[in-house]
Amino acid sequence: MSEYLLLLVGTVLVNNFVLVKFLGLCPFMGVSSKLESAIGMSMATTFVLTLASILSYLVNQYLLLPFDLGYLRTMSFILVIAVVVQFTEMLVQKTSASLHRALGIYLPLITTNCAVLGVALLNINEDHNFFESAIFGFGAAVGFSLVLILFSAMRERLAAADVPAPFKGGAIAMVTAGLMSLAFMGFTGLVK
């Protein structure tokens, strides 16, 4: 049980996919200008990342490995991710039309988020079992969400701050992301 907790904490804080592995930088920079959109993207990404991680593990174990189709791994994982995103979009549209409108274009954009494919491939490379795959996917999603929401809150405050003209916009966002990455480096010794 403690192994699973260490995997979760390690994935969320120590080996954060955005700040340490540099995966998912496009939505990190693109969706983080408003806190509302960052929260919506975080919720959708958490669901998709967790489900895609589990399904990718199952596809690999019960389809690709038994039939010696390892060379189709990346393509099949992309297909799994696209199916999960479409399923998520249909589910959200059917259950909550207001949430679907709020998420808007962000749902289909999850398909192109490299963090989702990265988690699926790292699950296989690190030889995780089913439960570890689920925890790894969920931990990666929580880490992505944590960083996205924190960064979004900082960018909203920076928009209201008196920032020198050369640093306005993307420049101060990159400096802030770098400082945030340095702060997360403090978690390095937390999990071995």
Swiss-Prot record:
Membrane-spanning intervals of the chain: 5-25, 39-59, 65-85, 102-122, 134-154, 171-191
EC class of the enzyme, as a word: translocase
Signal peptide start and end residues: none
Principal location class: membrane
EC number(s) on file: 7.-.-.-
CC per GO annotation: plasma membrane
Membrane topology listed for this record: Multi-pass membrane protein
Pfam families with a match to the protein in the record: Rnf-Nqr
HAMAP family given in the database record: RsxA_RnfA (MF_00459)
Family under the similarity heading: Belongs to the NqrDE/RnfAE family.
Entry protein name: Ion-translocating oxidoreductase complex subunit A
